[in-house]
Amino acid sequence: MPKRDDIQTILVVGSGPIIIGQAAEFDYAGTQACLALKEEGYRVILVNSNPATIMTDKEIADKVYIEPLTHDFIARIIRKEQPDALLPTLGGQTGLNMAIQLHDSGVLEANNVKLLGTELESIQQAEDREMFRTLMNDLNVPVPESDIVNTVEQAFEFKEQVGYPLIVRPAFTMGGTGGGICHNDAELKEVVSNGLHYSPATQCLIEKSIAGYKEIEYEVMRDKNDNAIVVCNMENIDPVGIHTGDSIVVAPSQTLSDVEYQMLRDVSLKVIRALGIEGGCNVQLALDPHSLNYYIIEVNPRVSRSSALASKATGYPIAKLAAKIAVGLTLDEMLNPITGTSYAAFEPTLDYVISKIPRFPFDKFEKGERELGTQMKATGEVMAIGRTYEESLLKAIRSLEYGVHHLGLPNGESYELDYIKERIGHQDDERLFFIGEAIRRGTSLEELHNMTKIDYFFLNKFQNIIDIEHELKNHQGDLEYLKYAKDYGFSDKVIAHRWDMEEKDIYELRMSQNIKPVYKMVDTCAAEFESTTPYYYGTYEDENESIVTDKEKILVLGSGPIRIGQGVEFDYATVHAVWAIQNAGYEAIIVNNNPETVSTDFSISDKLYFEPLTEEDVMNIINLEQPKGVVVQFGGQTAINLADKLAQHGVKILGTSLEDLNRAEDRKEFEALLREISVPQPQGKTATSPKEALKNAREIGYPVVVRPSYVLGGRAMEIVDNDQELENYMTQAVKASPEHPVLVDRYLTGKEIEVDAISDGETVVIPGIMEHIERAGVHSGDSIAVYPPQTLTQDEINTLEDYTIKLAKGLNIKGLINIQFVIAHDGVYVLEVNPRSSRTVPFLSKITDIQMAQLAMRAIMGETLAEMGYKQGIQPYSEGVYVKAPVFSFNKLKNVDITLGPEMKSTGEVMGKDLTLEKALYKGLTGSGFEVKDHGTVLMTVSDKDKDEIVKIAHRLNEIGYKILATRGTAQKLKDHNIPVEVVGKIGGEDDLLTRIQNGEVQIVINTMTKGKEIERDGFQIRRTTVENGVPCLTSLDTASALTNVIESMTFTMRNV
C-alpha cells in the first residue's frame, strides 16, 4: 500500500519531562518517529517541553516547539501551523491524553486535523477500564473479576463481594500512578481516593488480586491491512502484583511451554486486531503457573517502556516502523533496517537471553518506602545480553552501579538469616540480592518459591550461580573453573574475591591464558539472514563477529541507567559527541547499557557495544578495538569514575587529562590552584573522622555544608546548624575515613549562578550564564535557572567571566567545564567545578544555538575554537528569556520529604521561553505540572527565620485577592502587619490544617523547614499531604516570590482609593 498523500504536515506530540514511569524511552521513540516521517517526505512539527532531549533538536523535525504540553498551548500551535494530522502514540501517556483532550474540546475538528495511527475509539477502548472490560467479555478473553468505581463508597461495595487483596488501577494514567494493592479498609480508602484524584476521568478499576500469577508481556505490531506480528515476548521474574516497570524482566520468556506461548500469542494478536490498533502495542497477561488459565491485565495502545526494551532486545525498530504504519505503509512492504534484506513482517528470533533490571532511587531516598507494588518507583533501567540466563543476569546486576557486582549484598554475610527471610517476604528493590544470600545459607528453593512465587526455573538459575561460587572456592587458581565461571557471567572482581586475589591478578591471568570474550551481533533473526548491524554483546564463546576495521576509532562511554542526578542530559551530550567524531572522519564506538536511550539506538554510532560500564567490560572492548582514545566527559559520573582505572591500563583519556580531572576533585590541590589564580571560595576544611569534622565546623562557624568528596547530584549532602546535627550526619549519613574524607564548608547565603564553558586549552567560550531563582543551598538540579541573568550587575558578570576563564585555563580544560558560583554580600565565590558535561548543556545548547557537546568534542580532537569561529568570553545573548524548571516524581515515592536542599530530588526538567521573565516562568511552571491560578487560597506555615520575608509575599498575594490561611505563629506575624489572615489549627487539633488540604480548600502551600529533621515533624506531614492531594507546595521563599511575580503579571491588583 502506498503511503498517504492526503497529508503533508504532521504534528508529533512528545512526552514532556522525565518522571518515574515515563523516561528516556520516549525521547528514543520520538526521535525515531520524526526522522522516519521526514524520510517519507512529510513536514514534521514537534512539540515537547523537555529541552534535555535529542528529539527537540532542530535537525530532528522541520519545526520544533519547546512549549508546555497542555491543551491550551498545543491548541495555539495547531492554530498557528495548521497541520494536516496529529500523531499522538509516541508521546507516552501524555501524548495520548492530549489527543483525547484536543478531540473532546473540538480543536482537532475545527482545524481539520486528522489523528494518525491508532483510532481514537481504539485508544479509548484500551485506556477506559469499563470499555476495555466490555470488549474482552465480547471476545471471551478472561479479565480478573473487577468493578469500575468513581467514588470510594463504590469501592467498598465491591470489596464486600470479593474480599481482599484488591488491586486498584486508575484510568488514563501511566506507571500505575495513584494505584496500588490493598489488604485492608484503611489502604483501600487511601489508594482509591488517590487514584480518583490522579485519573483524568476520575475512574478506577478495582479488581480481585491475582498476585502470584506469572506476568507475561507481548510486544505486537499491526498495520491497516491487518498484518500483525509479535516482535518480542517477555517474562517478568516477579509475579503479578509488581509493576512491570519495577520488575526484573527476561526476554524471550523462559518458562512457557510451546502450548502456553502460542496460546498467549494468539490472544495478544486477537486483542490487537479487535482494538484495530495500527502501530505498536503492548499486551500484559497473567498466567496461572499450575494450569492453562490466564487473564489479560491491560493493553497499552502506544509505544511504551516495554517497546523500547523490545526494540533494543531484538534490534527491531518498533517506533520507526510504527510511525510509518501510521502514514499507511504496511509491514510486508517495509524492509527491516537491521538486516536490510528481510521484511518487517518477519517476526524476530533471538539466540541469546536479555535481562532488564530496574534502577531505583533509594540510594538517594534512604527513608523512602521501598516496598514494590502496582505503582512504579524505578527511575530507569539497565539491560544486559548473554548466551545463558545466568550470564545476562549477572551482567545486568553489575550495570546497576549500586555498589553490587553479584547476586548478593556487599556486607551480606553480616545479616541474620531471620532478617534475610523477613526482607525476602517484603517485595522490595533488594529482594533479588537477599534471595542469593538465603541460598548461600542453605535455604531450600521450595521455601523461597512459597515466599516469593518466583518460578523454580529462575530459582534454580540463582542456585546455579551460588553453586559455581562454591566450586570456585574449592578450586582456587584452576583455569578450567575460571573459564566455566566466565561462561556464566562471573566478573573478575567476584572470582578474585573467591580466590583471595586482586581483580587485576585475575585480569592478568586471563590475558596471559587468552581467556577473552568474543562479541556477537544482535541481528533480529538468530543469524538466519545476513545482517549489517553494528550492534554487539560480549560472551565467552569461540567465534567473534565484531570485525575490527583499520579506521582510527574513538570510544565514548555512555552514562548508564537514568537516576536522580544523572538523567537524559548526559545521553544527549553522548549522542552529540558521537556525531562530531563521525564528522571528523573517525569511527565512533559507544559503550552503554541503558535500553531507553537514543545513544543505544544502533543507527547512531558506527558500533554499539551493549555492555556493563565497568573496568573489566570496557577493557575487554578496548583490547579488541584498540581505539585512539576514550572520551569520559559526556557520560556523567559513571564515565568519570572509570577514567582512573582505564588510565592504569595505559588507555589514553581524551580531553582534559586525568591529573587535571583529579585536581578539580581533590580538595587540597583545588585549593592550591584557586590561591594561584586568585579565585575565592567559601572557607572549608576536610575531615576524616567525626571528631575532626566538629573541630572544623567550630573554626569555620555554623551553618556549614557537609558532603562526601566525589559525588554527583549532591548525594548525602546537608546544611547543618549545630554540633548535634553534625554528629548525627557524621554517624548516620557517611562513613568518613582517610580514603573517603568529608568536606566541611562555610554555608554562604546568596545568589547561585551556574556557568558552562568550552575550552580548547587556549580559548574559553562561555555560551551563557544562568542565574538560579532559589538562593544557594538548593541543589542546582532542583533550582529554577534563568537565562540571561536578570539581577546581576555588569561588574558581577565581568567577574564571573574572568573567574570562568581563569578556572578553565588553570585546570587545562579540553572540552567542557561546569562551574557553580555564589554571589554573597562581599563578592563572587566559586562553589564547585565539574570538569565534564553537565545537566545544563542541552538547555544552553537549545537557547544559544551553540552545539556545546559537539564543539567540545571537536576541541578534544584538536580543532581550535578560533578556527570554528568563536571568540573568547561570554557569547552574545539570545533574545527573550528562558527558564529551566525542575520536575519531581514525589507522588510515586512515599515517605520522601519534598523539602528542597543540597540533595537533588528532581527526575526531569522543562523549559519555558518567552519575551519576559514572568511569561517564561509561567510556561516553566505550567510545563512542570503546576497549575498557576489568579485567585484562590494559600496556606502559609514558615519557620521563625523566614517570618519577616513571608510578610512581603503575603502582602502581595493579598493585593491580588488571594485568601490567606496560616498557622498560629505565622498568622500572628501577618496580623502585626495588618494583613488579613485566617488562623488554622495544628495537626491533630480542631480545624486541622491537613483536613483543609485534603478537602481541596487550599490551592498553594508555602512551608519552610523547621530543624529537627525527623519524619515525625509536623512539617513533613504537611508536605506529604500536599503531594498525596496534588496541591503545589513551595519549600523555598524564592520560588514563592517568583510565583507571586507570575500571578501579578497575569492579573490586576485591587486597591481602594
Swiss-Prot record:
ATP-grasp domain boundaries: 133-327, 671-861
Region: Allosteric domain, residue numbers: 930-1057
Residues noted as binding Mn(2+) 3 in the record, renumbered to the chain: 820, 832
Reactions catalysed according to its record: hydrogencarbonate + L-glutamine + 2 ATP + H2O = carbamoyl phosphate + L-glutamate + 2 ADP + phosphate + 2 H(+)
HAMAP family: CPSase_L_chain_A (MF_01210_A), CPSase_L_chain_B (MF_01210_B)
Binding site residues for Mn(2+) 4: 832, 834
Gene Ontology biological process terms from the UniProt entry: 'de novo' UMP biosynthetic process; glutamine metabolic process; L-arginine biosynthetic process
EC number per UniProt: 6.3.4.16, 6.3.5.5
Record-listed Mg(2+) 1 binding positions: 284, 298
Binding site for ATP 1: 129, 169, 175-176, 208, 210, 215, 241-243, 284, 298
NCBIfam families membership: CPSaseII_lrg, PRK05294.1, PRK12815.1
Organism: Staphylococcus epidermidis (strain ATCC 35984 / DSM 28319 / BCRC 17069 / CCUG 31568 / BM 3577 / RP62A)
CDD domains: MGS_CPS_II
Name of the protein described by the UniProt record: Carbamoyl phosphate synthase large chain
Domain of life: Bacteria
Class in the EC hierarchy, top level: ligase
GO cellular component: cytoplasm
Sites where the protein binds Mg(2+) 4: 832, 834
Co-factor binding comment: Binds 4 Mg(2+) or Mn(2+) ions per subunit.
Region Oligomerization domain, residue ranges: 402-546
Record-listed Mg(2+) 2 binding positions: 298, 300
Domain notes: The large subunit is composed of 2 ATP-grasp domains that are involved in binding the 2 ATP molecules needed for carbamoyl phosphate synthesis. The N-terminal ATP-grasp domain (referred to as the carboxyphosphate synthetic component) catalyzes the ATP-dependent phosphorylation of hydrogencarbonate to carboxyphosphate and the subsequent nucleophilic attack by ammonia to form a carbamate intermediate.
Known pathway: Amino-acid biosynthesis; L-arginine biosynthesis; carbamoyl phosphate from bicarbonate: step 1/1; Pyrimidine metabolism; UMP biosynthesis via de novo pathway; (S)-dihydroorotate from bicarbonate: step 1/3
Chain residues that bind Mg(2+) 3: 820, 832
Function: Large subunit of the glutamine-dependent carbamoyl phosphate synthetase (CPSase). CPSase catalyzes the formation of carbamoyl phosphate from the ammonia moiety of glutamine, carbonate, and phosphate donated by ATP, constituting the first step of 2 biosynthetic pathways, one leading to arginine and/or urea and the other to pyrimidine nucleotides.
Chain segments carrying region Carboxyphosphate synthetic domain: 1-401
Residues the record lists as binding Mn(2+) 2: 298, 300
